[in-house]
């Protein structure tokens, strides 16, 4: 999911597409979910990562730090992409060194899936998902099949619901038990089934 963006003057660490834990360095849960990836911030943008706007708020961002404010991110993406967030508090940790420190870069590596678009509903917001096409609408709701959730997983999306929180990233990265039943979060499917389908789609 992604376009060509002006390269920053730094080494680009390309992170191959694949399962989330192939490119997530570590995960923390401060006030939200903070992901540390194996690439600097500008490399993340250049290589096809969605940079959460909220991560760039209140962090003392400036040009010489290599970080962008909300308008900067919007300008870089040229309004070609839709970025959805579950809340403004997600990814709100201090990220002063995100652009220069590979261990603190934050963003979502998204697969090259030009045929997929997410049609967000107010009660089913999808966090930090960058889309490059409107050819197909995938509407997440209670009756959705594992196939639909597989699309979100394939995009590295963090799924939040009104009545509960199902953090796909956390289960993929931290938990060995991928058969966790999502029904208690209002999702009529299991993560394992969705993962199987996501794998088959590749």
UniProtKB/Swiss-Prot annotation:
ANK repeat windows: 95-109, 110-120, 122-132, 133-138, 142-161, 163-170, 171-182, 184, 185-191, 193-202
Keywords noted in UniProt: ANK repeat, Disulfide bond, Exocytosis, Membrane, Neurotoxin, Presynaptic neurotoxin, Repeat, Secreted, Target cell membrane, Target membrane, Toxin, Transmembrane
Tissue-level expression: Expressed in venom gland, cephalothorax, and abdomen tissues from both males and females.
UniProt GO BP: exocytosis
Residues covered by region (4C4.1 epitope): 175-181
Modification after translation, per record: Processed by furin-like proteases at both the N- and C-termini.
Localisation: Secreted; Target cell membrane
Record GO terms (molecular function): toxin activity
An annotated GO cellular component: membrane
Its biological purpose: Presynaptic neurotoxin that causes massive release of neurotransmitters from vertebrate (but not invertebrate) nerve terminals and endocrine cells via a complex mechanism involving activation of receptor(s) and toxin insertion into the plasma membrane with subsequent pore formation. Binds to neurexin-1-alpha (NRXN1) in a calcium dependent manner, adhesion G protein-coupled receptor L1 (ADGRL1, also termed latrophilin-1 and calcium-independent receptor of latrotoxin (CIRL)), and receptor-type tyrosine-protein phosphatase S (PTPRS), also termed PTP sigma.
Family from the record: Belongs to the cationic peptide 01 (latrotoxin) family. 03 (alpha-latrotoxin) subfamily.
Other known facts: Is the main neurotoxin responsible for the human envenomation syndrome known as latrodectism that results from bites by Latrodectus species. Iso and Leu residues are assigned by comparison with orthologs.
Record note on quaternary structure: Homotetramer in membranes.
Comment field on protein domains: The H8 helix is predicted to insert into membranes and form pores by assembling into tetramers. The helix is contained within a helical bundle domain that undergoes significant conformational changes during pore formation to allow exposure of the H8 transmembrane helix and transition of the toxin from a soluble monomer to a transmembrane tetramer.
Protein name: Alpha-latrotoxin-Lm1a
Species of the source: Latrodectus mactans (Black widow spider)
